[in-house]
Every structure is written in C-alpha cells, then in structure tokens.
C-alpha cells in the first residue's frame, strides 16, 4: 500500500492507522486476513491497516494497491509453454460480474487464442467464469511483466490451468 509507483499508495488507512505490506498468500497458502480496527478487535488480533471508507460510510476492510509479485518468465515464454488456451487482453464488466461475498465471477473477455505455443486468431465477446478461490488455486505460473493497472493495483501475466469459457 505504500509503493510510491502505485496510484493507490497511501500512508494511512481509512481510520488513520499506518498502512503496511500484508502478504496474503505465501507459497500458495493463505497467510493472513486483512483487518480494520473493528474486525481486529472482534478476533483479538491487531489491525493490518486495511480500513477503507467512503465519504458517508463507516470504515470497511479493503486493499490498497494490491499486487501479485512477478515471476521470472516473459509473457512470450509463458505463451510458448501453453499448447491450447486463450490469452486474455482485457475484460469487461468487473463492476457487475463479480460477487464479493462468494468470489464467483463471470465477465466479458477479449484476446487471442493460443495454439501450440503461439498467439492465434483474435476473439471478442467471450465470457470467462470461475471463482476467485478456484482461479488462485489454478495459477500455474506468474510472469515477470509486472505493471500497474488503473486504480493502483499491480499485476503480472498469469498462466491459469482451467477457466470456463463461452462465446466466440
């Protein structure tokens, strides 16, 4: 949350506590939960500096400048290792296609097919669906092409073993 390269970087959370790095997943296992003062007090732990709030709302729990740390391979190397798949260049409908309680998502996607390790024909108006939990479990590899996205989160290319696909 304090990475100055991110538009989402903040020194203090929505309750005025210092933000800090929280490693949520380490070596494929859940490492910690995020907390504001209220949730921390309820569970008898220390706040992780993760309070977020709107102008008229009470502080909730959320992330500031979330990042998936980069791996070693280039995007091209990741694609070369996929025999049959899709390369998603972008998604539509994140604001309405994700259930924040269950983790279910179904969003529009566009990109290219991957055939025998090379980018093939483009596709658009496809739908990808899964759960956030399943997608995290199905990550095979993380690319070294880290970049910040609008809103302050940071991301690298991911190779995901399975995801439901429908459409063109």
Residue ranges of model-derived segments:
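N-terminal small-residue-enriched
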Residues: 1-168
């Amino acid at each position: 949350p304090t990475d100055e390269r991110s538009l989402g970087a903040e020194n203090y959370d929505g309750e005025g506590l210092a933000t800090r790095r929280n490693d949520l997943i380490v070596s494929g296992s859940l490492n910690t939960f995020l907390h504001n003062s209220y949730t921390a007090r309820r569970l008898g732990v220390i706040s992780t500096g993760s309070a977020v709030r709107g102008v008229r709302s009470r502080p909730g729990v959320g992330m500031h400048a979330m990042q998936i740390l980069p791996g070693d391979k280039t995007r091209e190397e990741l694609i070369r290792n996929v025999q049959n798949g899709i390369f998603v260049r972008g998604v539509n409908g994140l604001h309405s296609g994700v259930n924040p309680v269950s983790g279910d998502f179904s969003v529009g996607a566009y990109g290219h097919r991957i055939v025998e390790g090379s980018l093939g024909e483009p596709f658009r108006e496809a739908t990808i669906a899964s759960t956030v939990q399943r997608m995290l479990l199905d990550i095979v590899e993380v690319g070294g092409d880290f970049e910040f996205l609008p809103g302050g989160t940071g991301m690298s290319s991911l190779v995901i073993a399975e995801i439901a696909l429908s459409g063109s």
